[in-house]
Design a protein with these regions (language model features):
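C-terminal scaffold of the Radical SAM
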Residues: 4-8, 27-48, 54-329
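Conserved N-terminal Rossmann-fold NAD(P)-binding element of oxidoreductases
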Residues: 11
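Local cysteine-cluster metal-coordination motifs and their immediate loop/turn environment
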Residues: 14-25
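Short, well-structured beta-strand/strand-turn elements
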Residues: 234-240, 336, 345-347
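Short amphipathic alpha-helical interaction segments
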Residues: 329-343
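A short, conserved structural fragment
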Residues: 342-352
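Minor-groove-contacting beta-hairpin "wing" of winged helix-turn-helix DNA-binding domains
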Residues: 353-357
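Short, amphipathic alpha-helical interaction segments positioned at domain boundaries
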Residues: 359-373
Length: 373
């Protein structure tokens, strides 16, 4: 997979019309705060314009970046370009919701320089969309998808969700069938995760909602991988599939490859030179700090060599590129662990790399514990 000459830039746009009942990301439903957020983002840029020289990926995530009025998107983009340098082939991604897409929005994003779209479809089943409290319908999702294709976007990705209570393999396959019928360049498939402090979390605590059990969730995962690979998609990261190497998400690969990246906005994370820092989560507190001329950083950590080692394993085993076998050299007991993982068909060896199987993807988050001192 790709190695990176430049860091990536992420901007968190924390605005939503309504809060989805499963979402634990930082977001607010008051759009009246957009001007304050935009001014704060401009101020935050000043802290980093000499620290990061050039980017080759720009990702607007949320929240719902497509909610921003065109003039505010243009203003944000102008200031980013004024303060930072970008490579000529920069990947510029914007997350969008189908119900926010007017007939003019695709062309406006294209003219701004956006060259990659991540469309939050979640399902091609209207009943499932209602359960998820999504504001769009299947017809709106199809219309948005057609709009971006008609506007000339060569890279459109779909976000889908499985593991909903009552969902069957056949209903999930129907969503996958419909998704692939549009030939999107990228598909992300996430299992519904019920977080404690969300409305779904409250329902689970009250016994009114039962998430998928682990065995069924694993079956859905394998089904997804097999289906999409048969359709010609590379299963290049646990939740992500691309139609060829050229359609991998460059920006997100930076996270998994431990490349440097800068995050602007409330709750955004950054990483550079072995240090990681993260911003204040609350929008009002974030804006106030910047209005007072202070960096909005909530915390910072410098990784120890052992943390770097374990994080490299954790992130590497999330991707089909795996982990360079060299990092295990002179680590007592690792050869035996690797042999056990191979016998269990969780990993295999490709050249000088240890690569997870689909079965290995299922337990990737727990594998670093085996290598901890």
């Amino acid at each position: 997979m790709t190695e990176f000459a430049h860091p990536g830039l992420y901007v968190h746009v924390p605005f939503c019309k309504t809060k989805c009942p499963y979402c634990d990301f930082t977001s607010v439903t008051s759009l009246s705060s957009i001007p304050d957020w935009l001014e704060a983002i401009k101020k935050e840029m000043l802290f980093y314009r000499d620290r990061f020289s050039r980017f080759d990926s720009l990702y607007l995530g949320g929240g719902t970046p497509s909610l921003l009025p065109d003039r505010d998107l243009a203003d944000l983009h102008h200031h980013l370009r004024s303060h930072f340098l970008f490579a000529g082939d920069t990947e510029f991604t914007v997350e969008v919701n189908p119900d926010d897409i007017s007939s003019s929005k695709p062309a406006a994003l294209r003219d701004l320089g956006v060259n990659r779209i991540s469309l939050g479809v979640q399902s091609f089943d209207d009943q499932e969309l209602r359960f998820l409290k999504r504001r769009h319908t299947v017809d709106q999702a199809v219309k948005a998808l057609d709009g971006f294709k008609d506007a000339g976007f060569a890279k459109v990705g779909l976000d889908l969700m499985y593991g909903l209570p009552g969902q069957t393999e056949s209903s999930w396959l129907k969503t996958l069938e419909q998704a692939t019928s549009f030939n999107p360049e990228h598909i992300s498939c996430y299992q519904l995760t019920v977080e404690e402090h969300t409305p779904f979390g409250v329902l689970r605590a009250q016994g009114e909602m039962k998430p998928l059990d682990e065995e069924t969730g694993s079956a859905f995962f394998v089904l997804t991988s097999v289906f999409l690979e048969e359709k010609g998609y590379l299963h290049y990261e646990i939740s992500n599939f691309a139609r060829g190497e050229e359609n991998l998400c460059r920006h997100n690969l930076k996270y998994w490859k431990r490349a440097p990246y800068l995050g602007l906005g409330p709750s955004a994370h950054s990483y550079q030179g072995g240090s990681r820092w993260w911003n204040l989560r609350d929008l009002e507190t974030y804006c106030r700090a910047l209005a007072e001329g202070k960096p909005p950083v909530a915390g910072l950590e410098t990784l120890t060599p052992e943390q770097v080692y374990l994080e490299t394993i954790l992130l590497g085993f999330r991707t089909r590129d795996g982990v360079d076998r060299e990092i295990f050299r002179n680590r007592p007991g690792t050869e035996e662990i690797l042999r056990h993982l191979q016998q269990a068909r969780l990993v295999h060896h490709v050249g000088g790399r240890v690569v997870p199987t689909v079965k290995g993807f299922l337990v990737a988050d727990s594998l670093p514990l085996l290598f901890a001192n």
